[in-house]
Amino acid sequence: MDKKKLEILLEGCLPYKEPMFHLEQYSTPTTIAAGILNIAYLKGDIEGKKIYDLGCGNGILSIGCALMGADKITGYDIDGNALEVAKKNSEKFCIDNITWVKSSVKNIRGKCDTVIQNPPFGVRNAKADRAFIT
């Protein structure tokens, strides 16, 4: 799938309207999501792969991976309300290969082929990004 088509499809994702700023939850714009996923796809990191989406929010990156042929995706987020939006988005796209899990990234175990994420940047909460990069 080409980047522009993916971007257009991802525009259909419902936004998460109640971000918790202390968790540094920010939406990933569709242009950025499509760009990141296109690069990962071209490098062979999506199609047929098992993917973890850390801090998945509304699920835009997970859904993009599913649309690009990922085998199995697990979206993790500490915020149950964000996961409800992610579930609605996967239902909207009739995607059934994504599992949504309420969990801190510190508690994730297991193996995958590819990790995608839009982590906190530690702007409001110093070192909030550490759990995502260690």
Residue ranges and their predicted role:
Residues M1-T134:
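Class I S-adenosyl-L-methionine-dependent methyltransferase catalytic core
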